[in-house]
Amino acid sequence: MFRFFSMLVLGDTARFNRFAERLQLAEQTTVGNPVVDLDLVTPDGTRCQLADIVKAHEGKTLLIDFWASWCGICRMSTPDIKTLYDSIDRSQFEVISVSCDEDDSAWREAMKEDKMPWTQYCLTPEGYKAFFLHYQTIGVPYYLLVNPEGKVIGNPGGVEQVEAMVKKELER
């Protein structure tokens, strides 16, 4: 906070403006706001938008699992997400995965190995940049939970938090 005020007092307007811009971007992804749109591609190469996918799942609680083939924690979490996915009626809850892989073949191989039963997408190069810029994350796994109205509920830090938040939302 001191650095923030120092920028103002010392007249470092360029740094202050960059800081303010980052705050505005981060605010877009806060609880209660719609999901920030990202450019994606399906396994068959079709380009699509995250906002359209979220809209298609309105009426359900949606878990968006951002992951990568090279992320050990992501891959180890998949069985726990499968268990959660299998335990809740599809009319109430859905999961989609969005890969942050830049290597298409690694993404495809990981999908085959992990046998995730839900729909898969991969960030395009533009989507990749937008993901890290707007969601202000430094890595994956990154979970985003969306309510049936298409608004962000939160971004739980792990599968245990995902499960607790999903159950709480379904009780609502």
Per-segment meaning from a language model:
Residues 1-48, 52-53, 59:
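Oxidative protein folding and maturation machinery
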Residues 36-39, 62-67, 96, 121:
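Conserved Rossmann-like nucleotide-binding pocket used by diverse enzymes
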Residues 66-83:
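Conserved redox-active cysteine motifs that mediate thiol-disulfide chemistry
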Residues 57-62, 66-70, 139:
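Short pre-active-site segment immediately N-terminal to redox-active cysteine/selenocysteine motifs
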Residues 86-128, 133, 137-140:
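Conserved segment of the thioredoxin-like fold in thiol-based oxidoreductases
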Residues 116, 123-169:
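Thiol/disulfide oxidoreductase modules built on the thioredoxin-like
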Residues 53-54, 159:
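A generic structural motif
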